[in-house]
């Protein structure tokens, strides 16, 4: 898995993606960050991760990715209904036509209430400007989750990747699995599962972009405790 991440870093709640008045130009930032990334290889990695997570989340029927980027997760997750939200409208996004795409600020767009069986947010929280923004996001997602649904959060765990955590220009908040649990509790969620070390911070230089090796990694939690630098947390509203 020599492609960047699965820390995708395309964010749904950022300022205007290509408007200099909005501050950081996210379109140009991600163009630079992923200029040498093989998107096909990256999708192959996510094919395995998405299927694994879908099973772990209880095979949800309706899934929302609120920071969907180029669609790697929603392309692969075998849910009946898939939604992608992102602030960046990537011209090269090659998303399954069955995926419903919503472009815009996550806090401004319309989403159905009590609708999704699962919300999966990957590498999003660290891009918010303040703990208050994290709280707003958790409240926003709680409103969209159906009764019995689940919120899954994945992101770099500062406790295990402090040296490289701020190598990304848009990483603003230092978060660990412990601080995220506090955020969830404060927002009224019930934390049901915590994996402090799940995926590597970046798969670039760790493993080749091989579906077989990705599957092997996902089936061997002992490897997570060595390579894992991202947390995975599941919580119910």
What role is predicted for each listed range?
Residues 1-114, 118-122, 134, 138, ...:
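Conserved N-terminal segment of class I S-adenosyl-L-methionine
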Residues 126:
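Active-site beta-alpha loop architecture of Rossmann-like, nucleotide-cofactor-dependent enzymes
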